[in-house]
Amino acid sequence: IVPGKNCTACGACVQKCPKSCISMKEDENGFLFPQVDTDECIGCGLCDRVCHLNINMRNDETKMAFACTHSSDDVLKVVYGCAYVTPTEPHHIRVARKEDLKKLRGSKYVQSEIGNSYQQVLNDLKFRKWVLFTGTPCQVAGLKAFLGKPYDTLVTADIVCHGVPSAAYFRKYIEGYEKKHGCTVRSFDFRSKENNCGTYAGICNIDNNNRTLTRKIFYFNEYYYFYFLKSELFRDSCYDCHYTNLFRPGDFTLGDFWGIDGKKLGFNSVDGCSLVLLNTDKAKKIFKELNVCSSKVELAFAVANNAQLRESSRHTDFRKTLLREYRECSAEEIQSCFKRRYCIARIKARIKYAVPRKVKKILLKYRHLTK
């Protein structure tokens, strides 16, 4: 098994082990790592051979980039993706009904547990079912390593990923939020379209005194959200990611299309615009059959406006302080330190958020014209 900091917790080794002697355990900072029961291990080496970091996943096929908005209800037969199974625990789940696809929507700025999804995918593929698997690049790479060979009926889509904090860190934050507000969190969406599109504002649905309430979550008010955007909370492997480039493991790459405001696309992007990279011939063929509003853009433009297509996220020495706070402090204490530490930055963020979106679009358009 790949040691320590390089491990991405994709879980392929856990599902491949013929003796089921590998399990995922949290370390002192809440990150998941594989742990081997040496008494049960037979030394077969499958865990090493299935690790995507030990396999060349480089995809050299010619890429195409598109700006897109969704305009179709067409779906594949089975979809795998990340969903909250509790308000603090995102897991990969299998979806076979159209009405359940909504569970996979929304941004989840926390690492999901794969569980036995790879084995479920294999079972579906054996029955010749069409499968769409979505996840972070390392999860897609983990699936492909687990399968060991390509399948005609498998379609994969990796996301433009900044990095993943631990579920334990997120769980601690939610527990602190519940204690502070005297409520029970029912759902959490970091980037809700109920707020202004393109803003870092989420939605938290809570139960409070027998009432169900909806509260906006602003990154400048919450330590977890703020530190995520500063790239200080991720697992070690995220800062040396193998997939922050154009050699993607997925057939498709999906993400927000930053920097697209001011571009003439030929369709209305007021509700947001997605970046879609077509990484394989399979993706290009499927894309032609989809009912989406799209506009082809230069690949170089997409890369220039999405940093994680060029380089891994970076952290500062401050990350050590945040991990120490996680180990030693309560959520209330971490929140209090955050507010004192970033008082001025939070005021500036509030002012920036108060500027109407229409004004921002005019300024962005002017910036493009003056370049």
Language-model regions: role of each:
Residues 1, 6, 12-29, 33, ...:
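Iron-sulfur cluster-binding cysteine motifs and their immediate structural context
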Residues 1-4, 36-39, 220-229:
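Short, intrinsically disordered, charge-biased short linear motifs at domain edges
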Residues 5-19, 39-54, 136-142, 233-246:
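Local cysteine-cluster metal-coordination motifs and their immediate loop/turn environment
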Residues 12-34, 202-223:
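Short, charged low-complexity linear segments at domain edges
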Residues 38-124, 302-324, 329-333:
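Flanking helices and flexible, charged tails adjoining ferredoxin-like Fe-S electron-transfer domains
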Residues 73, 86-88, 133-143, 163:
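Gly/Ser/Thr-rich loops at beta-strand to alpha-helix junctions
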Residues 152-176:
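Short, flexible loop segments at boundaries between secondary-structure elements
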Residues 178, 183-371:
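Long, compositionally biased charged/polar accessory segments in the mid-to-C-terminal portions
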